[in-house]
């Protein structure tokens, strides 16, 4: 029992360390997303976050605990920095939760209590993330995918849309639990291995 609690504390501290990438940027406000913007470098603006958590069977067990710890730390950080946060959970189907609304925070606890199972549909998750980017609230959001990345690369049309968003300043990040897959190393802007 004490060992499980210590492991959970370790995951939370480790998650906090890994998530510092979002809190180390300068605050520049009032930047609008336009088609003319071309960005080769990450924005300095601290904006909203879209986080996608892989809830497939391959994430069951220790990866699930790590993913949940990362998510808890990310939500805490978003609240502290007053950043809006949108959650996408994905396995065979994807589910969404807008954590910018405090009423949804209780639903987050329900999510954390469910086990991970099923296959993985990364394509659906990316399509949802791209649709959320079209909203005013989440325009220019950072996208963070927490996964083992054991799913197919996106189709060409999705990669094209990701490139369009990237040209406007959106950045796509990954926190990879395990090191089995390297499929997304060239698709995302940066992947940290956990």
Regions found by a protein language model. Give the residues of each.
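A generic secondary-structure signal
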Residues: 73-77, 128-135, 161
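Catalytic-core regions built around general acid/base machinery
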Residues: 74, 159-167, 172
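Conserved ATPase-coupling elements of RecA-like P-loop NTPase cores
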Residues: 62-64, 154-157
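Von Willebrand factor
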Residues: 44-101, 106-146, 150-153, 174-183
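Loop/turn elements at helix/coil->beta-strand transitions in domains of secreted/extracellular proteins
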Residues: 81-83, 139, 168-171
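Acidic/polar low-complexity segments with low predicted structural confidence
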Residues: 1-46
């Amino acid at each position: 029992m004490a060992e499980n609690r210590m492991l959970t504390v370790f995951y939370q501290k480790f998650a906090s360390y890994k998530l510092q990438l979002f809190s180390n940027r300068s605050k520049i406000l009032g930047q609008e997303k336009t088609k003319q913007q071309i960005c080769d470098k990450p924005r300095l603006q601290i904006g909203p976050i879209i986080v996608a958590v892989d809830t497939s069977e391959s994430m069951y067990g220790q990866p699930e605990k790590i993913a949940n710890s990362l998510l808890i730390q990310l939500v805490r950080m978003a609240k502290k920095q007053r950043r809006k946060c949108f959650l996408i959970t994905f396995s065979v189907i994807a589910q969404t939760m807008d954590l910018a609304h405090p009423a949804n925070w209780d639903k987050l606890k329900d999510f954390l209590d469910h086990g991970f199972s099923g296959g993985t549909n990364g394509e659906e998750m990316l399509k949802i993330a791209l649709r959320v980017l079209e909203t005013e609230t989440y325009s220019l959001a950072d996208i963070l995918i927490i996964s083992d990345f054991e799913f197919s690369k996106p189709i060409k049309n999705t990669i094209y849309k990701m490139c369009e968003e990237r040209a406007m300043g959106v950045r796509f990040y990954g926190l990879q639990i395990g090191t089995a897959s390297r499929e997304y190393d060239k698709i995302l802007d940066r992947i940290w291995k956990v």
